[in-house]
Structures are given as structure tokens and as C-alpha cells.
Amino acid sequence: MLNMKNIDRKVVATVAVFLLLAVVYFIPKPVLRMALPEIVVKYRIVGPLLTLSLAGIFLAPRLMTLAMIFSLCGDYMGAAGNFIGQMSFFAAAHAMLIAFFVQRFRTLPADLQACRYQESVPDGAPARKGVRAKALTVICSATAAAALLTFALTCIIPHVPAGVTRIGCVIYAVLICSMLALSMLQRHGLFALGAALFLFSDIILSWHRFVSPVPYSKYLIMITYYSGQLILWLTAVAKDEYKTRCQTC
């Protein structure tokens, strides 16, 4: 879990602004128009990710910050009604998250790599059981990603208009499922939770757009989206995460 002692005041301030702007997004437009210019009302969706992007320049790893920036651009394109642009920028965001997870795993200290797959292995058990635990984690991650990708390809993609949009959706589905699988390989529950919320948001959005209307879709999509992004960002900026994790292995 996230160690609150590793979160500084700048991060707390960032989260406060993020939550405030997220609440503003859900305020009805007629109410907002009484106090804000029309352009601010139209593009208010970008506020929370703009906050994470700007703060991330100083607080977060570079790849995570790039993921937030591309997500911000995706939000802007969505508000502007450009679905292809929206999908393209979010695909880039997932590519950055994939790179972040790969880099993070490859650069873990050797002692943490040694202990992270021994967590479920009893003391004194043969070392090969740790290898089996690692293999099981990889298999479970790949299976989950494959199942979700199969669901997207069979239940959603056939309803997408043929052509560039459908091709883009297939590529996007592969990227986001890969991102989820890699988040699970981190063996850090919050990374996996954030990625899962992000994916759930996209499933609801695509189902609502291409298959059939989803009740309360705005709230289901945006609450899970904002929550997932915030969890990913917060987990990435936590100080001394590797040291804390290794001490608890």
C-alpha cells in the first residue's frame, strides 16, 4: 500500500486541486455558465489532468508525466468532439505507461527483485517455488489481458464503424490490455488498481458509444477515469517506494 509518510506537501496540494477540479467537472453546465466563460465550461474536463501534468514535471517520473500529458490532450480532443484525436492521444498515454512499467521493473534493486516473488513462499521452502510464483504471476497477468482483449474484439469492435476508427480501436485495445498486464507484473496493488480503473472507464465509454447506451455513463466513465489516473500518479510519486517495499517483503 501507499505509505503516507512518503507523500510531501506539494503532492497533497496537487491532490487537493485535482479533486476540486474533478468536482467542478460534475457541476451542471447551466450553473457553471453563471460564473465561468463558455470556453472554460466546455473544456473543464482537462482541469484534473492538467494539474497532474504540471505537478508531474517536478514530482513524477518522466514517463508517468508524459502519460498524464497525453491523457490531457486526449481529454481536450474528446471535449472538442474529435474521437480519432482523442483515441490517438490516449493510445500514446498507454504507450508511456507501458514504457514506465517496463522501465520500473527492469530498474528495481536486485534485493527487491529477489523478494517480490517470494512474498507467498513460506520460509525454508525450495527456491524453485519462488520461480513458480513468478511464473504464476506472469501467467495470470497474460490471461487477464488476453481475456479482456478477447472481450473487446468480440463484443465491442464489431460494432465500431469499419475503416480507420475500427483499426484504431483494435490497436488501442491491444495497448490498454498490455498496460494492464504490465501493471499487474509490478506486484504493487495500487498500480494494478489504477490501471484496472482506467481500463474499466474505457470499456464503459466504448460500450456506450458503439454498442448501447449505459445508464449514468458520465459518472461511471469519469469517476473511474479520474480515480485511476490519480492512483497511478500518486503511486509513482511516492518517495523511497522501493526501499519501503523491500523492507516489508
Name these PLM-found stretches.
Residues 2-249:
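Polytopic alpha-helical membrane-helix bundles and their juxtamembrane interface segments
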